[in-house]
Amino acid sequence: MAIAEEEAALIEDSVSDSVDHRGLPAGKSSTGGWRSAWYIIGVEVGERFAYFGIGSNLITYLTGPLGQSTATAAVNVNTWSGTASILPVLGAFIADAYLGRYRTIVVASLIYILGLGLLTLSSILILMGLSEQRQHNRNASAKPFFWVNILFFCSLYLVAIGQGGHKPCVQAFGADQFDVGDPKERISRGSFFNWWFLSLSAGITLSIIVVVYVQDNVNWALGFGIPCLFMVMALALFLFGRKTYRYPRGDREGKNNAFARIGRVFLVAFKNRKLKLTHSGQLEVGSYKKCKGQLEFLAKALLPGEGGVEPCSSRDVEDAMALVRLIPIWITSVVSTIPYAQYATFFTKQGVTVDRKILPGFEIPPASFQALIGLSIFISVPTYERVFLPLARLITKKPSGITMLQRIGAGMVLSSLNMVVAALVEMKRLETAKEHGLVDRPDATIPMSIWWFVPQYLLLGMIDVFSLVGTQEFFYDQVPTELRSIGLALSLSAMGLASFLSGFLITVINWATGKNGGDSWFNTNLNRAHVDYFYWLLAAFTAIGFLAFLLLSRLYVYRRVDQV
């Protein structure tokens, strides 16, 4: 009798579909929750410190030691950041289908550290090579050797590969530490996404302030070496918390591949495409009602096919439908995210041309102004949690305050507004350069304070809190349970594709406006460029994307995760 009561208590204390580090059912009191989540948040702080230590000032390195033009450097930055944001789809696939999130994080971290180490080595070789060239040839415009360039870009893309495996799995693994079947832990999981973003913003801000200063005022080798050290510390912290984690059962034991299950739905539906979907006793009543009228092509996978084709289960069909419904939302997210790619490229290059003195005798590096994004997030997240959400709950009578799609939509509006503000500030900068006769003096400092750029950086932080966090929570919540790494990867891939599109737009516009001897919108001399026209174009794109998003969000049917 006592044994039976002990077993019942153990079952009541355990978390369904999760095990501990020994492979036993995960206990609520001994694993998971905020205790484990803070280890994982700490890991992400270190990783974001490393990533932004490289990415935030990359355009300065490309146009400086590597000697690239502004347009070429902007395209290279967008291509790299786009690749780094697309690769999480592959990393999530490997995690969800084969390795599991924990093992994928460890392997990806090792690749990440290798890339950062080689990046540091390449920067040492580049700086040594440039120094030797200038001593022997007295050529101030010397460029690094080709093979050293190759090493630099290979190491840079190794970092992207490491980030591709690390990024979607760490956040999903953190969210896995909360049991959605427990009402209190479900609320905590919602807060996790907000505090996750606030904490990693601390890592980003610290990186932008410290690492960028070292890169601009000490040397690039040390500026790349510090992020490598932080990534080593992040991996050590992650391994230290191993015994406290809850592991999804798929990470510790074999199970049906979710990709195979859902892929089979599309295959069977295609084979049954000529069959008529009618309730003739072949379908269960519940399955028929759920599928009737929405994506009926996939619902045909529920029918027994010719030649003895086994029908798919209603759960598999519903999971496939959930993924398909996400595609239109994902596409509009891509369009509205294009403006986000500009802060690490043109915002930074514009900052080089203006007065950057913020204190007597102290001139802030232009890339360090990105720290204002983190400051905005520090203010916006607590305001969102403690002020905005309670007011929204009073008005809407919903526990969540606003829906995830409403949160994303608010971010889209702010994104369009941000491009309008950026365009107006750039018009002011060009006008000031013209008034003081500095149009043909690109190296001269325009008598305009860098504080003019504050609003567009603060708006970027607010966009993150609404659009980026909302998108991550939405895709994590709405994909099938076994594919949550893929869900987060989809939100990241929207940013990646947006970076590629931004690079493509820059290439096309640079060619179209710069041919026949004209001044390109992205002229290396920014005083003769028209980046403001580009910002107006992006504001229009984002507004159109928001209108499409409004229509699609009204048609979207939320997937009830708590019932799956």
From Swiss-Prot:
Membrane protein topology class: Multi-pass membrane protein
Localization per Swiss-Prot or TrEMBL: Membrane
Record's keyword terms, sorted: Membrane, Phosphoprotein, Transmembrane, Transmembrane helix, Transport
Signal peptide interval: none
Protein's UniProt keywords contain Transmembrane: yes
Keyword field contains Transport: yes
GO molecular function: dipeptide transmembrane transporter activity; low-affinity nitrate transmembrane transporter activity; tripeptide transmembrane transporter activity
Highest rank taxon of the organism: Eukaryota
Alphabetical GO biological process terms: nitrate transmembrane transport
InterPro entries: MFS_trans_sf, NRT1/PTR, POT_fam, PTR2_symporter_CS
Record-listed Phosphothreonine modification sites: 104
Pfam hit, one: PTR2
Name the record gives this protein: Protein NRT1/ PTR FAMILY 5.16
Annotated source species: Arabidopsis thaliana
